[in-house]
């Protein structure tokens, strides 16, 4: 993949990005790189700074400090050069209330040299039978139309802000299949999400953002590693440090919320035995025991001490 001037480049480079709204620091030194042809997910809870980051990358906001380059260009100064190659899906939609789906898509398609076939795109996203005006569309219909608007120009890079929010399960799966097809076609995708299954299924690279900072970055496999998770419920307020001391080296024990415990370790029968024995010695009994691979949510909880959906 090449930049607009013909040179090979990463699709997006964000370096020490900072942004404030009045006295509120929304972004504090955010840095990451998006490889051309990849799917990168910005993962974090609502209010983490994901949308602000994407809006700077799209050229809708100027950074307070730091820099952003899209195909090697400044997204604000070089907006005209980037516009034909970049698709944007906005949470707010940016569509007139009286507009209807197909006329909107046909109008947008007229601005591009090689647009996608509007009827095919509308059918794929279930918009071909939507007759309501934008103000009367359901939340899911608005999301599907916003996604179609981002894709109709056949972009080389597309920003998708919470692409499946408000969609029913079938529409969500369809949107995921479209993202997977975009990657297969060599299109670079940057999406924001707080949905773990969305990030784990779609992303080649995940950037975990919390309170305006990047707290981790890597492929889903790199972030989750080889550790497994044992969860159980017991009396609230147990000494998690004392329990961890009875487990194999490197084991991590957390309580969140009160009375719910997570043990991250390479699990084996000896770990379950040690947990059960320690609980018994401390006057409680573990129940609701389950185990599985460490997830991105486990990683987020470990890094921030709070649930991803908080």
Language model segments and positions:
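Conserved ABC ATPase "signature" region
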Residues: 106, 110, 116-131
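ABC transporter nucleotide-binding domain
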Residues: 175-266
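Helix-to-loop junction immediately C-terminal to a conserved catalytic motif
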Residues: 58
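Hydrophobic anchor residue at the start of the ABC signature
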Residues: 147
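Conserved ABC transporter NBD signature motif
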Residues: 66-74, 81-82
């Amino acid at each position: 993949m090449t930049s607009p001037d013909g040179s090979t480049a990463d699709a997006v480079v964000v370096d020490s990005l900072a942004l404030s709204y009045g006295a509120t620091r929304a972004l504090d030194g955010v840095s990451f790189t998006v490889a051309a042809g990849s799917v990168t997910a910005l993962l974090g809870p609502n209010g983490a700074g994901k949308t602000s980051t994407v809006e700077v990358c799209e050229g809708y906001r100027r950074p307070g400090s730091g820099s952003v380059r899209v195909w090697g260009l400044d997204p604000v100064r070089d907006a005209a050069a980037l516009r034909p190659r970049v698709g944007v899906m906005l949470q707010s939609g940016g569509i007139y209330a009286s507009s209807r789906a197909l006329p909107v898509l046909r109008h947008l398609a007229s601005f591009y040299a090689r647009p996608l076939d509007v009827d095919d795109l509308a059918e794929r996203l279930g918009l071909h039978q939507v007759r309501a005006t934008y103000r009367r569309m359901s939340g899911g219909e608005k999301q599907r139309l916003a996604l179609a608007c981002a894709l109709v120009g056949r972009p080389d890079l597309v920003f998708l802000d919470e692409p499946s929010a408000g969609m029913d399960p079938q529409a969500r799966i369809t949107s995921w299949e479209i993202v997977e097809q975009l990657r297969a076609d060599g299109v670079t995708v940057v999406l924001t999400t707080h949905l773990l299954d969305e990030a784990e299924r779609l992303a080649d690279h995940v950037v975990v953002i919390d309170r305006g900072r990047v707290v981790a970055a890597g492929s889903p496999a790199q972030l989750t590693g080889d550790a497994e998770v044992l969860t159980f419920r017991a009396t609230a307020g147990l000494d998690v440090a004392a329990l961890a001391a009875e487990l194999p080296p490197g084991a991590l024990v957390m309580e969140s919320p009160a009375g719910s415990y997570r043990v991250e370790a390479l699990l084996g029968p000896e770990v379950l035995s040690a947990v059960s024995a320690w609980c018994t010695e401390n006057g409680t009994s573990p129940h609701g025991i389950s185990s599985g691979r460490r997830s991105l949510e486990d990683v987020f909880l470990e890094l921030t001490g709070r649930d991803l959906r908080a």
